[in-house]
Regions:
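Alpha-helical membrane segments of multi-pass proteins
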Residues: 1-139
């Protein structure tokens, strides 16, 4: 249970965010939209990433191109976040439940990729690449 608690907590948080009043409120007002967006990307996604990574065998966490992954994930996050905040896509997500679901799924996917990059490796190189991904995304 100690290995999977972040995964379970992330799932419960997603359920609270997506099944509560926020999705409907987010269609009409900016503040609930941002609470939902940040709750998915900055609270649920890191918990899910930590929980999922804990389930991987240790040898899977040793390889990879940390810097290339960090740059690619940062670019992906940038495109997804800013793309959905462009007026046409933002309005489409507010008007259509399907588009809203796609928006939320893409926010979660980008968040998982970003936090997975930050937490994935065991080396200092991976930690530095993860920190770089976070820094680039926050700009």
């Amino acid at each position: 249970m100690t290995r999977v608690w972040p995964l379970l907590a992330g799932m419960m948080l997603l359920a609270a965010l997506w099944l509560g009043p926020l999705p409907e409120m987010a269609r009409r007002a900016f503040s609930p939209h941002m609470i939902l967006h940040l709750g998915v990307t900055l609270a649920a996604a890191p918990l899910l990433a930590i929980g999922a990574i804990r389930l991987l065998p240790g040898h899977w966490r040793d390889g990879g191109q940390a810097l290339a992954a960090a740059l690619a994930v940062s670019a992906l996050d940038f495109v997804i976040v800013w793309g959905w905040h462009a007026p046409a896509l933002h309005e489409a997500a507010a008007a259509s439940p399907i588009m809203f679901a796609i928006q939320q799924a893409s926010f979660l996917g980008a968040g998982l990729a970003l936090w997975g990059t930050a937490f994935f490796g065991r080396s200092r190189r991976h930690a530095a690449a993860g920190a770089l991904a976070m820094l680039l995304t926050s700009m």
